[in-house]
Structure formats: structure tokens, C-alpha cells
């Protein structure tokens, strides 16, 4: 078992897809998102401000207000254990903004 987990590009993309689906038309979003990855679940609690172009409503920027990310790993006895991970909002931002 690892002491901490690496958040891969595919996990960032999965989080970005979930968040983008909830952002439609909003200027502020707060929620909890989960991505399963084998025997672990990565959770992200997130609050962001969504800046939009005045005329088109296109998302032009995002600002994180607060976030917390952790990984839940099932132990051999079936009990869940919280583990740290290397989540970086800048990488999620890139996935959300298509950069």
C-alpha cells in the first residue's frame, strides 16, 4: 500500500468532465466530486468562481475559492482509510480550460 497517491491526467480529466457538466450557466459552483480508480476513490470538495464572457457566456477564467482532495482506500479488513494525494488545482484548471 502506498503512503500517498498520484493524481493522473486521466483522473484530472474525469474530475474536469464532472465539474464542467455542473458549471453550465453558473458563476459559482460548490460541490463534491468522486472518481473511482481501481481499489481507491479520489474525492474532491471544491468551490470555484466561474468568470464568463458578458455576451456569449463562454467561460474565460476560473478562480478557486476552496478545495480539499483526498483518496479513500479500502483496507484488507474492508475498512476505508483516508490517504493523502498530490492534487494540484493548477492541473485541474488546465483540464477544465482545455489547456
Language model: regions and residue ranges:
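Acidic, low-complexity intrinsically disordered segments
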Residues: 2-28, 32, 55-99
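Beta-strand elements of well-folded, non-transmembrane domains
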Residues: 35-54, 69-71
